[in-house]
């Protein structure tokens, strides 16, 4: 893998694996069979150097369900990755309806920057944008789009326009393997001003993918 190239794997729901060179980081692991069987997703069998979570809900922070346990990291440097957090709310009522706060994760490495919006439930606020736009341009933005528990399509596009990433990966949307009340990714794609590229569960993010006009990358197309 050449410098500046990284691989992203989607495991389901809001869980992603990041590989940069020989180093790896898992984001927001779910619990297989969680929520009374609603999370009908397979165990995460790949090993990782470390795990980071956006918030403590069981569909995002089930470290004890990993096949290969890995240490949890919070912020600062871990291997080649530097993690920073921006605290936001799970809904538009300061977290009173959907369970408090969630963090936005910014992960910088090898002249790249990935941002995972967690379960953000409101439009971007000036302080959010000030914090997130303080660093280099975002290469890849992972944004929830399914609504109900998080923002939906319209507010997701507010975040995308405000942060202007090179590429967007929509997540936390309807999935036949997840029995939660979520809207399909198609609602988000219907108003996309950017070209859409469909891939399967993994994608190699290189200069060719990230250098041109902003685009939407839909991962795991067979699952939607």
Predicted regions and their residues:
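Zn-dependent metallo-beta-lactamase
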Residues: 1-21, 78-86, 210-211, 217-224
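Metallo-beta-lactamase
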Residues: 3, 62-103, 107-111, 193-213
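Residues that mark the start of a beta-strand
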Residues: 7, 23-24, 111-113
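Binuclear metal-ion centers of metallo-dependent hydrolases, dominated by the metallo-beta-lactamase
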Residues: 9, 99, 163, 167-224
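Pre-active-site segment of Zn-dependent metallo-hydrolases
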Residues: 15-52, 60-72, 87-100, 120-134
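Active-site metal-binding loops of divalent metal-dependent hydrolases
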Residues: 29-31, 56, 88-89, 118-122, ...
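Conserved acidic residues
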Residues: 49, 139, 166
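Active-site-proximal loop/helix segments of hydrolase catalytic cores
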Residues: 93-163, 176, 180
């Amino acid at each position: 893998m050449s410098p500046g190239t990284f691989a992203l794997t989607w495991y389901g729901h809001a869980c992603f694996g990041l590989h940069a060179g020989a180093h790896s980081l898992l984001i927001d692991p779910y619990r297989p069979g969680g929520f009374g069987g609603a999370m009908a997703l397979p165990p995460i069998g790949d090993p990782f150097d470390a795990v980071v979570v956006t918030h403590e809900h069981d569909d995002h922070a089930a470290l004890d369900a990993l096949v290969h346990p890995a240490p949890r990291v919070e912020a600062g440097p871990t291997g080649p990755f530097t993690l920073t957090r921006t605290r936001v709310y799970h809904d538009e009522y300061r977290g009173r309806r959907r369970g408090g706060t969630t963090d936005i994760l910014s992960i910088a490495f090898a002249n790249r920057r990935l941002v995972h919006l967690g379960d953000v439930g409101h439009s971007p606020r000036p302080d959010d944008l000030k914090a997130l736009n303080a660093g280099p341009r975002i290469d890849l933005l992972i944004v929830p789009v399914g609504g109900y528990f998080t923002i939906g399509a319209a507010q997701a596009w507010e975040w995308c326009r405000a942060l202007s990433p090179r590429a967007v990966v929509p997540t936390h949307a309807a999935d036949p393997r997840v029995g939660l009340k979520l809207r399909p990714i198609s609602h988000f794609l219907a108003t996309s001003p950017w070209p859409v590229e469909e891939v399967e569960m993994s994608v190699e993010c290189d200069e060719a993918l990230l250098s041109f006009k902003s685009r939407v990358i839909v991962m795991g197309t067979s699952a939607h």
